[in-house]
A protein has these predicted regions:
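N-terminal [4Fe-4S]-dependent radical SAM core
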Residues: 1-31
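Canonical Radical SAM [4Fe-4S] cluster-binding loop centered on the CxxxCxxC motif
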Residues: 22-62
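Structural preference for beta-strand elements that scaffold enzyme active sites
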Residues: 28-30, 78-80, 104-108, 132-136
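A secondary-structure boundary/capping signal
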Residues: 33-34, 82-83, 110
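Conserved phosphate-binding and hydrolysis motifs of nucleotide-dependent enzymes
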Residues: 42, 83-84
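Canonical radical SAM enzyme core domain
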Residues: 52-66, 85-127, 135-161
Length: 161
């Protein structure tokens, strides 16, 4: 039984008049476009992403477009995407280009799936945008053995190629 379940069983909690706070402004929007699917299985992952975790499905381009339209009315200035691993999403390049039409974008990734062809596509997307495209690369250490112990065999080599 979770804390929410315990709280709901408590009459004092159930009887609280909790006000609803409308969302009228939002500066930053985080989108979990990679769902919980990841090519790695890091020991510390806070949502246990991995190759078989489909708890939260990847966002589709249509899902992203809906959130972007909402974000415009809320005044969002910055966008972040995360997962799982965002580069497992088949629509990732279209998603990146579309988000960049709205504002600067930070991509959280382990970069192990980036090939030279994908890097060239990313460069083209950045060059066609007036907004900045940045990457936040997740690694545990500059030490290959330590990194691989946490993220999986050969993850350091794949990320640094």
């Amino acid at each position: 039984m979770g804390l929410c379940d315990i709280g709901l069983k408590n009459k004092a909690v159930r009887d609280l008049d909790i006000p609803e706070v409308p969302l009228v402004k939002l500066d930053t929007l985080w989108l979990q476009v990679g769902g919980t699917l990841c090519n790695l299985q890091c020991t510390h992952c806070f949502i246990s992403c991995g190759p078989q975790n489909h708890t939260h499905e990847m966002m589709t381009m249509k899902d992203v477009q809906q959130r972007l339209l909402e974000s415009k009315t809320l005044g969002v200035k910055d966008y972040y995407i995360t997962g799982g691993e965002v580069f497992m999403n088949a629509e990732i390049f279209e998603i990146l280009a579309t988000i960049l039409e709205y504002g600067p974008l930070d991509v959280l990734t382990n970069v192990t799936l980036i090939t030279s062809e994908k890097a060239a596509r990313l460069k083209k997307i950045q060059n066609n945008s007036s907004h900045k495209l940045q990457f936040r690369v997740s690694m545990e250490s500059f030490d290959e053995k330590l990194n691989d112990r946490t993220r999986g065999k050969n993850s350091f080599r794949k990320a640094t190629e």
